[in-house]
Amino acid sequence: MSAIVSEVAVTEKRINHVLVVIAMEAEAAPLLMRLNLSILPSISPSAPCIIYSGLYKDCTVSVVTNGKCGKHGVDNVGTVPASLSTFLAVHQLNPDLIINAGTAGGFQKKGAMIGDSYICSHMANHDRRIPIPGFTDYGTGCYDAYPTPNIILVSMTY
């Protein structure tokens, strides 16, 4: 299946605030330390997500993590905690750019390390198993990623 959106008109706008969404604290820790980000007050008393923020050069950088599961004490992972954390952070911070970062299941066996960056050309869902006839392929899916030639160019020249 091809991407639903092939092109979007992008207006030139200075990016003053970047929000990075990262599910797990261990994934976020190197970025938090490198940028010396400080924890902000809770987004919502009932939401476990945590926001960190600070300045890098002349840009505000915020990181939101999904927080811990109150029952099991592990990092909240998956689409529901990610959606909630992202929504609440966007609502509170109004960022210019949102980056979803993480390992999406991890690639340590393939040599990936925390901090490595990858630009995908395709994506699939590995947490949407739907055992209903006709929904299996939809649930796992295999979709083209939105084309990002400028991001790829920047990452190759960095």
Where are these regions (language model features)?
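Structural motif
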Residues: 97-99
